[in-house]
């Protein structure tokens, strides 16, 4: 029962944060320095993401200042896939995030 309560609180907290910072998600990228701790654990790095999910030659991070959330995403970067050969592979769970 304790686990359910904890998960409920975590879910509510996540929803509140998402609503408050709805624009932040649009600017976020796997290259964003502020979320780099999750790279390789929660999501693929840019190069791997592009190669596996788009069959691209490579992926690279480039400077992309946050328009919606500059206070939360300073020095923001975005991932760009070079020579992507396919649409995103949504059947592969590692390509979802």
Swiss-Prot record:
Disulfide bond residue pairs: 24-31, 46-50, 53-95, 61-69, 79-81
Function text: Has a bactericidal activity. Active against M.luteus. No activity toward E.coli and F.oxysporum.
Stretch forming the signal peptide: 1-22
Name of the protein in question: Theromacin
InterPro entries xrefs: Macin, Macin_sf
Keywords in alphabetical order: Antimicrobial, Disulfide bond, Secreted, Signal
Keyword match Protease: no
GO terms under cellular component: extracellular region
Cellular location(s): Secreted
One of the protein's GO biological processes: defense response
